[in-house]
Amino acid sequence: FLHSAELNSIGGNTCNLGCNMCSYGCSSKYNSEAYKLHEIDYMLPKPSNYGKFIEDLKQFNILEMKFTGGEPLLIKENFDVMSQLNKDTLVRVITNGTVDPTTLIDTLKDFKVNILVSAEGPKEVTEYIRHGSNFDIVLKHFDMMQRVWGDSVTFTTTINALNISRIPELFKIRKAHAGSPVTSNFYSLSSIPDDIKEMYLQKLYEIGNIDLIKFLENAEYNETDMWKMLRHIKRRDRLRGTNLLDVFPEWKEYYETCNG
């Protein structure tokens, strides 16, 4: 037996979204933008290792398999792996919800599943942070999967400097939970200056979300990271034709001061 295995970009990093808080190597779309912005000087796709993996897979009876990204529903080989799994395997999938899930449903309709659909808050928040996303389409695909798997389908978020006070709005739209705080880059909660932090905390106090309140109360402001984040945002706003202040006007003083 192999208790669990995770396919984290083992089939490449193909992805159709450029999420702000992503990182080099995890998303082909993010890499493409970073290359255009001269943040990286080369752009190579992450190679697929599926051939060897599928051969090795035959040696094990896997109890739990997790498919992450890139965007797992864009990677054909993921479905090849799924089709070889025993129906007793719990299959976990993290998807951005933009890809038609019909093939996923056909492949896994008889499996035990846990489907996490990534979003960052309501429509405008998700579409800004997860650039390229269409929240209406995401909701359509979410509902398609929920009709098959019920409460095994849920929204999940990252908890970052931009969205923390908007996450509870997602809870009113569909079944959802707040995921884990961003810790690997400057979109962490430490990039929130004290005045905006107080504003966000007041909003969360009114809602009463204890977990989000604790995360934010424990965050120590790092001004250097805040400016790094805003420069990162400004470069992408110019490239994409977007504007942070259309969705997060509370950042106006800092955004307009930032030389990105």
Region spans (language model):
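Leucine-rich repeat
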Residues: 49-54, 78-80, 103-104
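Conserved C-terminal portion of the radical SAM core fold
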Residues: 92, 111-116, 136-259
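Core AdoMet radical
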Residues: 2-14, 25-48, 60-75, 86-102, ...
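Residues at alpha-helix caps and immediate loop-helix transition turns in enzyme cores, especially N-
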Residues: 77-78, 104, 134, 166-170
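N-terminal pre-core extensions flanking Radical SAM catalytic domains
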Residues: 1-42, 58-59, 213-260
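Generic structural signal for well-ordered alpha-helical scaffold segments
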Residues: 54-55, 143
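A general structural signal for stabilizing positions within well-ordered secondary structure
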Residues: 56-57, 107, 147
